[in-house]
Amino acid sequence: MQQDKQPDYHPVVFRDRAAGYAFLTRSTATSDKTIEWDDGETYPVVDVEISSESHPFYTGKARTVDSEGRIAQFERRYGSTGPGSDGGGAA
């Protein structure tokens, strides 16, 4: 077997800047920035824009999407003018 084929797997801190939340895990991600963690050790830190602490799905602040169908929405806006309706049409 060939040696050194696997990427370096090491402890990394991921920091959610929006929520002010950070967690220590193991990853192959690298960074030049470091942070001192609660245990006194220094770890590389990777800043992320969104995590489970700030994502609307996990925080319960998700917007509800209108589930009305496109055909129903069209008919509501413009009315039903198909065959058999009172809207007229070709005679």
From Swiss-Prot:
<dbReference type="InterPro" id="IPR042105">
    <property type="entry name" value="Ribosomal_bL31_sf"/>
</dbReference>
<comment type="similarity">
    <text>Belongs to the bacterial ribosomal protein bL31 family. Type B subfamily.</text>
</comment>
<dbReference type="GO" id="GO:0005840">
    <property type="term" value="C:ribosome"/>
</dbReference>
<dbReference type="InterPro" id="IPR034704">
    <property type="entry name" value="Ribosomal_bL28/bL31-like_sf"/>
</dbReference>
<dbReference type="GO" id="GO:1990904">
    <property type="term" value="C:ribonucleoprotein complex"/>
</dbReference>
<comment type="subunit">
    <text>Part of the 50S ribosomal subunit.</text>
</comment>
<dbReference type="InterPro" id="IPR002150">
    <property type="entry name" value="Ribosomal_bL31"/>
</dbReference>
<keyword id="KW-0689">Ribosomal protein</keyword>
<protein>
    <recommendedName>
        <fullName>Large ribosomal subunit protein bL31B-1</fullName>
    </recommendedName>
</protein>
<dbReference type="GO" id="GO:0003735">
    <property type="term" value="F:structural constituent of ribosome"/>
</dbReference>
<dbReference type="Pfam" id="PF01197">
    <property type="entry name" value="Ribosomal_L31"/>
</dbReference>
<keyword id="KW-0687">Ribonucleoprotein</keyword>
<dbReference type="GO" id="GO:0006412">
    <property type="term" value="P:translation"/>
</dbReference>
<dbReference type="InterPro" id="IPR027493">
    <property type="entry name" value="Ribosomal_bL31_B"/>
</dbReference>
